[in-house]
Amino acid sequence: MKLSMPRFDRSPVLVVGDVMLDRYWHGCTTRISPEAPVPVVKVEQMEDRPGGAANVALNIAALGGAATLVGVTGADEAADSLARSLASAGVDVHFQRIASQPTIVKLRVMSRHQQLLRMDFEEPFATDAAALAAEVEGLLAGIRVLVLSDYGKGALKNHQALIQAARARGIAVLADPKGKDFGIYRGADLITPNLAEFENVVGRCADEGELVARGARLMADLELGALLVTRGEHGMTLMRPGHPPLHLPARAREVFDVTGAGDTVISTLAAALAAGEELPQAVALANLAAGIVVGKLGTATISVPELRRAVQREQGSERGVLGLEQLLLAIEDAHAQGEKIVFTNGCFDILHAGHVTYLEQARAQGDRLIVAVNDDASVTRLKGPGRPINTVDRRMAVLAGLGAVDWVISFAEDTPERLLEQIRPDVLVKGGDYGIDQVVGADIVRAHGGEVRVLGLVENSSTTGIVEKIRRQP
């Protein structure tokens, strides 16, 4: 499946659901209490993070989407902490505050990144369902996706009123469901239960065939547009009426903490669909996002550079032949990782030992090496009739196969000034007997804070010499 990064800044999403505060007390444990056989945690840091529906909205905002959040809280310090965190991240917050009840707080006591204890402070909210529905309806103008983030804590009382209000306006409805009655989500465009939640409703599935069959019946019974079952280490399965199931394997490189992974899935789905992505592509992006977030501690968000890097890795463009847009994204991510970008250019018509040695030396000047290759027309202009021997596609394919080369791109001009203006490498490398001021593009690179270095060439090793030698053969 071909993936690309959506324009998330075009993603207006309304999130409605159970808001909670994830509170962390971080410290270390070095002894057992003399009062009882329990560890003593010396608390060194306290941290608050938005959780539940608030985490969904925060994830959408972290991707650059326009997130609006409607939820229910108490009139207390925890609600104030949530509102501050969300507002600072750009989320438009609409809380229905109930003075007689506390904001839901999940307090986790951590010792050296290990969770020792979780304490929940909560009561089911006595929500004014009519007032909440009226507020939601007043916010639907301009929204592309409505997310129902349901943790069963009482914020969502009349699901159907919200679903029908959105559908009447052509707004897609996504629901992260809870409980045994999925009928309350009837008519939703997509629901995203995890496997345990799904089997709690349809019964245990012996294999994927049974999972798909029961999913199809559920979609038909509830008039759902689609069903996405998240399956932990087994990835996720997308089912749509009239389409074969789409199974996506898990993409986590390391699982550290699964807290909030479901929030990440539905938030990425919502942002991608609001940005115009088709559902299979949006699901694939959500799968990559989940693989990133489970490698983080606690309730967490992912950034655009993190997701972009995962997309590039998935598409095999972490290395190889790239177009300009792909290359600029790869450079941005490399710089975010603190990597130094090296650039060199040439015709590389017949790759020889001198080229290989030179490229290895160039790569040693930094962390990533870009090789820009003259296209066929420019090689002919520079080298004369009969050149190039190899087409630009073949030349780039050979270069991309070298261990020293990270990215290869072609250019149509005789010299790479235009490309250098766009790429702005940290180091420009050229081989030969040049002064630095004679290197084409040196002024451009130095104007942007880069360096220019000249490397020696391997003697008695040149493409022109090889071509002439071949032509002299009888």
From Swiss-Prot:
PROSITE patterns: PFKB_KINASES_1
InterPro entries attached to this UniProt entry: Bifunc_HldE (IPR023030), Carboh/pur_kinase_PfkB_CS (IPR002173), Cyt_trans-like (IPR004821), PfkB_dom (IPR011611), RfaE_dom_I (IPR011913), RfaE_dom_II (IPR011914), Ribokinase-like (IPR029056), Rossmann-like_a/b/a_fold (IPR014729)
Coiled coil: none
Function: Catalyzes the ADP transfer from ATP to D-glycero-beta-D-manno-heptose 1-phosphate, yielding ADP-D-glycero-beta-D-manno-heptose.
Biological process according to GO: ADP-L-glycero-beta-D-manno-heptose biosynthetic process
Enzyme class: transferase
Reaction catalyzed: D-glycero-beta-D-manno-heptose 7-phosphate + ATP = D-glycero-beta-D-manno-heptose 1,7-bisphosphate + ADP + H(+); D-glycero-beta-D-manno-heptose 1-phosphate + ATP + H(+) = ADP-D-glycero-beta-D-manno-heptose + diphosphate
Functional pathway: Nucleotide-sugar biosynthesis; ADP-L-glycero-beta-D-manno-heptose biosynthesis; ADP-L-glycero-beta-D-manno-heptose from D-glycero-beta-D-manno-heptose 7-phosphate: step 1/4; Nucleotide-sugar biosynthesis; ADP-L-glycero-beta-D-manno-heptose biosynthesis; ADP-L-glycero-beta-D-manno-heptose from D-glycero-beta-D-manno-heptose 7-phosphate: step 3/4
The entry's keywords: ATP-binding, Carbohydrate metabolism, Kinase, Multifunctional enzyme, Nucleotide-binding, Nucleotidyltransferase, Transferase
Entry's family note: In the N-terminal section; belongs to the carbohydrate kinase PfkB family.
Xref: PANTHER family: BIFUNCTIONAL PROTEIN HLDE
EC number: 2.7.1.167, 2.7.7.70
Region described as Cytidylyltransferase: spans on this chain: 343-474
Region (Ribokinase): 1-317
Superkingdom of source: Bacteria
Matches recorded under Pfam families: CTP_transf_like, PfkB
Name of this protein: Bifunctional protein HldE
Residues of the active site: D263
Residues reported in the UniProt entry to bind ATP: N194, L195, A196, E197
